[in-house]
């Protein structure tokens, strides 16, 4: 296919136009008074949301070059979402500000490579400062504050996540389900999560999120490598009659058997997903036995004289819901408390008997997985559109609280970055010179962009507020919800340090890439064919056959 090639300033300006469009669409959602965005869907009701990365994923422009700019900024949002689970809008606004300031300097004749070096050095300095100023999370109140801010100032959600973390521990599993009522409820059930995802992406039931979600599934557990599909046929036929989904957790599944399962899944004959069992050797077998206890099933192993081809439905485990993505599998089990408790006691006894610290550690991991349980938040709302928005906010809030537990919290509302702006300027003036200093100044000028946008979305003058905040102590900032300057930590306006750090790093990375672009190669726009002449012999007018 023919390509068009664009050079120099023209290339960078075309990228900038795409970046402007995406940044503006996403930035309207920033802060406590940020607005919503409506996404039109080809099928079903439109989606009304407030989530930066979801909006970014929806934007496709007609112009291929501008679309490349959109894709670059979308990457900053996506990477931040993958690393910290929140802060995608902040990353987009930061990247946009850095690109705008950087392009002005490149147009004026600055060397883009040296500018990028300055941007990278400034970012490295700021990451250290964010870590220095972060405070570890000490109580559930701080967790609730973090969740509240990430969920768009919804205190009920923040409190619910804090309660969930109290019940399942800070490393525990919190899963989301669509509820049946108007209210959002918290429930703690038996369950576990392990670090193995689906063997093939074709098992995903939700292609947008690339997840396989199976309700009320049967669970086949075996420590055997499944090489031939014939071994599975008897049990698959029994399950197909029940109409329920099936999850296979095995040592491995060979290509032939896997291909058969995928084809059956795609044709809708059987809703099935397959996962490799976690761990190795005896430890893998022990973990599979834990799962068998949890799901009220049996581990099909030749050590116990059980063969796959003779498996019956009674030997299979059952669960309330299983969610599988490319990296993890979460099992939410039905009530089976007595058996789980007995299994936990057995593991504790093994821990007392072993002298090896390594074995003790691994047994402790198994105990935590089995005893920790899963906190299930059932999202309630009046309409499906509201439920989808609420679910995205809850997801952000859960990710933000986990990020806060990992790396601590910093003052929120764009305050931390705004306060670091004069600190960076002072450091850069002493340590950098020439165009590297200009690169650092680009970052310094961009640091107030999130705060300015939050203030503007609340109807205030962003530039004035950013300057006022810089003169105040580090913890003080602008509360956009009330329009007052407050101590952010006392007011409960906090962000996870990991979210702020990831957003800054990804924004700087994308800005550096855009500034050092000198040429773009893109597809030529396709010429639209004029409609075929109506009524031609054997043709149905404009219809394609």
From Swiss-Prot:
PROSITE patterns attached to this UniProt entry: CHAPERONINS_CPN60 (PS00296)
Ligand binding (ATP): 29-32, 86-90, 413, 479-481, 495
The family this protein is said to belong to: Belongs to the chaperonin (HSP60) family.
Biological process terms in GO annotation: protein refolding
Protein name as annotated: Chaperonin GroEL 2
Keywords noted in UniProt: ATP-binding, Chaperone, Cytoplasm, Isomerase, Nucleotide-binding
Subunit organization: Forms a cylinder of 14 subunits composed of two heptameric rings stacked back-to-back. Interacts with the co-chaperonin GroES.
Annotated gene: groEL2
């Amino acid at each position: 296919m023919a390509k068009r090639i664009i050079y120099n300033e023209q290339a960078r300006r075309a990228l900038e136009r795409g970046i402007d469009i995406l940044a503006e669409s996403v930035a309207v959602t920033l802060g406590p008074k940020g607005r919503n965005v409506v996404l039109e869907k080809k099928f079903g009701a439109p989606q009304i949301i407030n989530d930066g990365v979801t909006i970014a994923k929806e934007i496709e422009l007609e112009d291929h070059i501008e679309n490349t700019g959109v894709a670059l900024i979308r990457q900053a949002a996506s990477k931040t979402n993958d690393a910290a689970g929140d802060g995608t809008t902040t990353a987009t606004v930061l990247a946009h500000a850095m690109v705008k300031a950087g392009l002005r300097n490149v147009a004026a004749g600055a060397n883009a490579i040296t500018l990028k070096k300055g941007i990278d050095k400034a970012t490295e300095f700021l990451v250290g400062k964010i870590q220095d100023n972060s405070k570890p999370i000490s109580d559930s109140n701080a967790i609730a504050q973090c969740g509240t801010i990430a969920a768009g100032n919804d205190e009920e959600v923040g409190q619910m996540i804090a309660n969930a973390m109290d019940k399942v521990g800070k490393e525990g599993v919190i899963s989301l389900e669509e509820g049946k009522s108007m209210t959002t409820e918290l429930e703690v059930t038996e369950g576990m999560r392990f670090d193995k995802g689906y063997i093939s992406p074709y098992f995903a039931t939700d292609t947008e999120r690339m997840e396989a979600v199976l309700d009320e599934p049967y669970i086949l557990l075996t420590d055997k490598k499944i090489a031939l599909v014939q071994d599975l046929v008897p049990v698959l036929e029994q399950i197909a009659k029940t109409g329920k989904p099936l999850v296979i957790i095995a040592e491995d599944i060979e290509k032939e058997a896997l291909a058969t399962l995928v084809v059956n899944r795609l044709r809708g004959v059987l809703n099935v997903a397959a996962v490799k069992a976690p761990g190795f050797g005896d430890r893998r077998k022990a973990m599979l036995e834990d799962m068998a206890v949890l799901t009220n099933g049996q581990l099909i192993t030749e050590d116990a004289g059980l063969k796959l081809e003779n498996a019956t439905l009674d030997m299979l485990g059952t669960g309330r819901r299983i969610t599988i993505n490319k990296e993890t599998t979460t099992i939410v089990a039905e009530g089976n408390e007595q058996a789980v408790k007995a299994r936990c006691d057995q593991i504790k006894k093994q821990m007392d008997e072993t002298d090896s610290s390594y074995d003790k550690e691994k047994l402790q991991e198994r105990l935590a997985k089995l005893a920790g349980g899963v906190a299930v938040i059932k999202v309630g709302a009046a309409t499906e559109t509201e439920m989808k928005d609420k679910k995205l906010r809850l997801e952000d809030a859960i990710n933000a609280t986990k990020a806060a537990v990992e790396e601590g919290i910093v003052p929120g509302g764009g305050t931390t970055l705004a306060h670091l702006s004069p600190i960076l300027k002072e450091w850069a003036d002493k340590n950098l010179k020439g165009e590297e200093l200009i690169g650092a100044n680009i970052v310094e000028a961009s640091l107030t962009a999130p705060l300015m946008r939050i203030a503007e979305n609340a109807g205030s003058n962003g530039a004035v507020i950013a300057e006022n905040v810089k003169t105040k102590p580090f913890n003080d900032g602008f509360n956009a919800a009330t329009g007052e300057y407050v101590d952010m930590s006392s007011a409960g306006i906090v962000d996870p340090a990991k979210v702020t750090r990831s957003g800054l790093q990804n924004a700087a990375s994308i800005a550096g890439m855009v500034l050092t672009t000198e040429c773009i190669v893109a597809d030529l726009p396709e010429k639209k064919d004029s409609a075929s002449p109506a009524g031609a012999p054997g043709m149905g007018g404009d219809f394609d056959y």
